[in-house]
Amino acid sequence: MKKGQSILGILFFTLLFGLCFQQNALNVEAKTRVIHKDITPKEAASSDLKVIKKVTKLAAHRWIQSYTMDSKYYYYIQMTSPYTGNLRITRVKYRGLGRYIKDHMDLKKFGHATNLDCSVSNGQTWLWTGSDCKGNDVSRAISGFRYQKNKTLRKHGTIHYKIPDAKSKKYMTNVYPAINQNSTQMAVRYTYGGKQYYQIYNLAKGRFINPRNPVKRICLSATSGDFQGFDLYGTSIYTIEGSPRKSF
């Protein structure tokens, strides 16, 4: 998800990067804030945020799993029903209050869509999410692809990477990507051995990483929350979690 959203049921981890490379887990400082409510809190009187009008319905009838945006469009990703790793992306371009253009594309056998992000290079937007699902391993790779109206992609995108753990060298499953604000780095999150890891890669031309050569590898203990997504911004990683039955 892109930058600066206030979200219900959240557990923020601010991860301070240090000198950590492939073989060493990074020492981090975790800062948390938990909201124990199931309803959206009222905005403060001083807030400039106001819901004026509902704008559009999305192309699928399930919860939004994640979303991202570039300078022209918003992209929302949802599971489709019945769920077998199939996803749908709705692209929305707003043209003023109550006016918009909407279309969609489908992703078959991709996974759970825990994270959707985008990179921009030479004026081209590349969307990134988990892919290559199989059984309970909802994503065994990450994929990058250009948005194409009414197009269906199967299993993975134009570019896809399997992600090995930098220490064990084993390929990881349940992998999710996030891109920093200037499309120069990618973070990939996965769980392994009861812990959660984030590997940071240099991103060339908004598309290319060396999956065996992360510039940082961060390790955190497992948390009690239900992981919902994360983002990479500057030198920090922000995660969002909630309880399975009460988050959104």
Give names to the regions the model predicted:
Residues 1-29:
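Sec-dependent N-terminal signal peptides of Gram-positive bacterial secreted proteins and lipoproteins
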Residues 32-56, 65-108, 245-248:
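Beta-propeller domains
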Residues 46-52, 140-179:
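Asp-box/WD-like beta-propeller blade repeats and closely related beta-sheet repeat scaffolds
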Residues 55-61, 104-109, 160-171, 218-223:
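Surface loop/turn motifs at the tips and blade-to-blade linkers of beta-strand repeat domains
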Residues 57-71, 112-128, 168-185, 226-234:
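Structural signature of eukaryotic scaffold interfaces centered on beta-propeller domains
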Residues 166-222:
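Hydrophobic, aromatic-enriched interface-forming segments
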Residues 220-248:
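Loop/turn-rich, solvent-exposed surfaces of beta-rich toroidal or solenoidal domains
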